[in-house]
Amino acid sequence: YYIEYTIESLDVERLEQMINLVISKNDALRLIVTHEGKASFLDNVPYYSVPVYSLYDGNDREQKRLERSHHRYNYYKWPMFHFCVGKTSGKTSVLHVDFDCIILDAWSAKLLLNEIFSLYYGKDVKFPRISFMNYMRLKTDKGDLEAEEYWKEKVKNRPSFPKLNYQKKFAEVQNVR
């Protein structure tokens, strides 16, 4: 997922603070995938710094757009999103935003960006009082918990995945779109 915004008189430091606030309130922005293929939500992540580059002409913008719109994330490492700002010689800035769709679909990304911009422009944003994970735990009844424990035990004793022969190693595959 990639989108960019042209913004006049952008305060990058304020934007960065609002992005970090939203990261702290949103489990999906703290998600990584373990080597076992399970989602893991990090409790603590480093402060996210928004890189800034000089935007001299349309070619710089196009180059950044091409780079970010085709970026492939490492699922085992945080973050799986990227914000950066191109600054012109005037007051115009370009905010480039991309996410891996494993953490957010387009609707969720739009909602998240609306939260960031609302906070940036001083509007009040109501964040959920509990995380999605805690909400799901509250909704789960005792029978579901027993069933979950049963299946966790079953999964521990399942056979390993089959070894598949590939024409190339995944690391050798290039230009995937």
Regions found by a protein language model. Give the residues of each.
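Short, charged/polar, Gly/Pro-enriched secondary-structure boundary elements
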Residues: 43-51
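Flexible, P/S/T/G-rich "lid" or insertion loops adjacent to the active sites of thioester-utilizing
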Residues: 147-177
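Short amphipathic
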Residues: 3-6, 51-54, 177
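Acyl-group handoff/entry surfaces in thioester-processing enzymes
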Residues: 1-43, 57-141, 156-164
